[in-house]
Amino acid sequence: MARIAGVNIPNHQHTEIGLTAIFGIGRTRSRSICVAAGVDFSKKVKDLTDADLEKLREEVGKFVVEGDLRREVTMNIKRLMDLGCYRGVRHRKGLPMRGQRTRTNARTRKGPRRAAQALKK
């Protein structure tokens, strides 16, 4: 397995798809990285030479990916929560922050339904 940015890239996949295993790299960015590195994106990862892998590592290194990106996203959310702005409050409460309705739906953010407790007599 090829190792790029601390992630093992699956050997059986095409280079374009394999690079998407790295957090922060999607299909579009993956293809642009392959073009910039001069590597055929339809080539399987197992068929890449060491020189190709080194070029890919160099191109991926130009972007914020994996741990650094995760840390940046977490810090952005923490900043919103510390500011106390609407989005931060919604993050803190675990509710949707982009204007979706919550009277019904929003189960992904709110979690599973709590069972209604029976009334005591």
Swiss-Prot record:
Pfam family, one: Ribosomal_S13
Family the entry assigns: Belongs to the universal ribosomal protein uS13 family.
Disulfide bonds: none
One MF term in the entry's GO annotations: structural constituent of ribosome
Protein's recorded name: Small ribosomal subunit protein uS13
Gene from which the chain derives: rpsM
Annotated function: Located at the top of the head of the 30S subunit, it contacts several helices of the 16S rRNA. In the 70S ribosome it contacts the 23S rRNA (bridge B1a) and protein L5 of the 50S subunit (bridge B1b), connecting the 2 subunits; these bridges are implicated in subunit movement. Contacts the tRNAs in the A and P-sites.
Quaternary structure note: Part of the 30S ribosomal subunit. Forms a loose heterodimer with protein S19. Forms two bridges to the 50S subunit in the 70S ribosome.
Keyword Plastid applies: no
Gene3D superfamilies per UniProt: 1.10.8.50, 30s ribosomal protein s13, domain 2
Region (Disordered), start-end ranges: 92-121
Gene Ontology biological process terms, A to Z: translation
Biological source species: Burkholderia multivorans (strain ATCC 17616 / 249)
PANTHER family: 30S RIBOSOMAL PROTEIN S13/40S RIBOSOMAL PROTEIN S18, SMALL RIBOSOMAL SUBUNIT PROTEIN US13M
